[in-house]
Structures are given as structure tokens and as C-alpha cells.
Amino acid sequence: MLARNDDTSSYLLVKPVTKKEIYSNDLENGNVKRGASTHSLYLIGDPKFCRNNSSKQKSIIILCGPTASGKSYLGHELAKAYNGEIINIDSMQVYKEIPIITASPPKSYKTEILYHLYNFLSMTEDFSVIKYLKLATEKIKEITDRGKLPILIGGTGLYINSLVFGYNNIPDISEDLREQVRNLHAKIGNIELWGKLEKLDPLAASKINQNDTQRLIRAYEVFMQTNKSIFSFQTLPKEQILPDFNFKIIFLNPERKFLYKTCDERLDKIFKEGAIDEIALIKKQFAPKDYTNWKAVGIKEILAYLNGNLTLDEALNAAQIRTRQYAKRQVTWFKNQIQDKITLEYTNQEEFTQTLKKPFKTI
């Protein structure tokens, strides 16, 4: 496993060294074969990485990366090694009705480590980045006040970007207006709503695809609430969330062929271990308007199976394809949008799991 600091393009062991030096040193010591990846997370350089008492700034770890990359396992091991607690930073794992389809951490993990902001919200409740930031900052401060290390795990780029770099403070949308806009969309659909947006806010319409339902509705309701384009708020200074904290971002970046394999295997396991029954239950509990915007991969495909539009194999295959596409977008986003990060690269499961068996001595 390679640990790369993206600021310096160097690979980190006990001290920053070049990739060439890593292979040279390890070959001399007999640790690795030529061309093999280097060892493990415990060799990542900064001794103060996880120690909240070593400086005035308190540390926060953010463990990010594509779906099915091993974030939950790695985060759990870090929490055990460094007296940490886990905070969710995934927009779908907040919902209590769908722990299986969203691959939320297993109950066995939660008996060992405290987990926060997982599976607590009803699918019928509105949630937003602003609401997430409020809850997450409260949990971060509670955890550090207890002398523990906050470890945030997830793949929702908007949440991560807003927490680390700040956010544009768009006024809250009233519940009445939100309901009106959603009812309007249900009645007229994307194309006609986009046409209305174009007349009111041509800037937003020029930047939003007609098929992007979530962004389309959001832009329309923001204009109706504020009489301003949603994009006008992006020119304002961002409001910093946690200026007194030091963020350490670890990006898991598996080799693509291996990542796609783990995506397929995860979906297959999820389908076999209760996802069908889970989605069948919420299909009975909620009206269709309540779940049309649910974005978790697999929900739409399982609904199509339950409605008789796809066979089970077809639904699984469709969900696997969409998961791989989503994972690819996540990798691209994290590579391009988060510059100050440590990147962990690995090519197979054995390399990932074996390297993590060593102690995390110098993180």
C-alpha cells in the first residue's frame, strides 16, 4: 500500500521520502520485492497526526473515497488504535430505514466503538448540507471535549468540502415553499420546471441539466425564497465551520479493476442479505412521492424488480453498473477537488488487509 502526500508528491514513511527512496530502502532491508507496494498505514509520517494534545489545534481525520473501498473497516481500526469515535459523512447512511442497501456499519462495530449520525433520520424528513454541518460540528466538539479523536467516514463530497473549506450560507427554505415546489415538480415534471426556472433565473438554467432533478428543484426553490440565483451565493465569502481544527484527510484510491470487483461483490452480498425485504418494507410504508428522490444505489433497481419491471438478476446487474459509475465519479471528484490529502493506493484485497494488521504507530 502506498501512502502519498498530494501536496509534495512524496510518499510518507517515518519521514517524507521519495518513491525511489522507499523502494531502495525496502529492497536493501528485504521488506518487499521489486515493484511491490510498500507496507502500511502505521508508517505514515507525521507523529502528531492523530494526537489532539500535541498542539493548540485539535485534529480531525476524514477518511474518504469511493464506495466499497474499505473506508468503514479502516476507520474502525483507526478508532480502536487511537481512542477515536466515528462520525458519518455519507448523505445516504443517515436514514434509519435503509441500513442494508446503504452498507451502513454493522452492529458488531458499534459494540466496540461509538458511532454517530448513522441511521437516525426518517426517509420522509428533509435533510441538507446545512443541517448535516450543524449536527457534525456538535458531535466533533463533544468528542474532542471527551479527549477522543473524531474520525469522519464517508464519500459525500459536498459534505466533506463544506466541513473542511466552509460553505455558502444560503437562507433556509420554508417548509411550505419546499412542499409547493415538490408538488409542482410532481405535476409538471423536469422539462417544464426547467422552463420556468429559465424565465426566472437564466443563469441557473444554463448551468443545470434538465435531467438533474435534485439541483433543478433546489435552484427553483432558492430563487422563489430569495429572489436571487442560487449561484449568486457562491460569490460570497464562505463561512468557516471549524477554524480551530486541523483536518487530516485520507483518500482511499483502489486500482480501478479491483474497485469495480469490490463494488460488484458488495451489491451481490447486499442483495442476498436483506436489501430486497428492506426496500419492500419501505415500499409498503411510504407513498411513492416519499421515495422518488432517494439516491442510494440499488433502491430504484429493487423497486423495479418488486414492480415486475426487472428480474432479480437484471436488477442486480443494473445496480452494479450504477455503483461502478458512481464510484468512478467519486474517485474523479476526490482527486480533483481535495488537494491537501494523503492518498492510499492498493491493487487487491490481500494487500489492503495484510498491511492494516500492523500497528498504527506513527500516525
Swiss-Prot record:
GO terms for biological process: tRNA modification. The keyword Hydrolase does not apply. SUPFAM superfamilies: P-loop containing nucleoside triphosphate hydrolases. Residues 90-93, 214-218 are annotated as: Interaction with substrate tRNA. One of its GO terms (molecular function) is tRNA dimethylallyltransferase activity. Disulfide bonds: none annotated. Substrate binds at T67, A68, S69, G70, K71, S72. The record marks T156, R178 as: Interaction with substrate tRNA. Its EC number is 2.5.1.75. Its cofactor is Mg(2+). Belongs to the IPP transferase family. Catalyzes the transfer of a dimethylallyl group onto the adenine at position 37 in tRNAs that read codons beginning with uridine, leading to the formation of N6-(dimethylallyl)adenosine (i(6)A). NCBIfam families: miaA (TIGR00174). PANTHER family: TRNA DIMETHYLALLYLTRANSFERASE. This is tRNA dimethylallyltransferase. The lineage of its organism: Bacteria, Pseudomonadati, Pseudomonadota, Alphaproteobacteria, Rickettsiales. The gene is miaA.
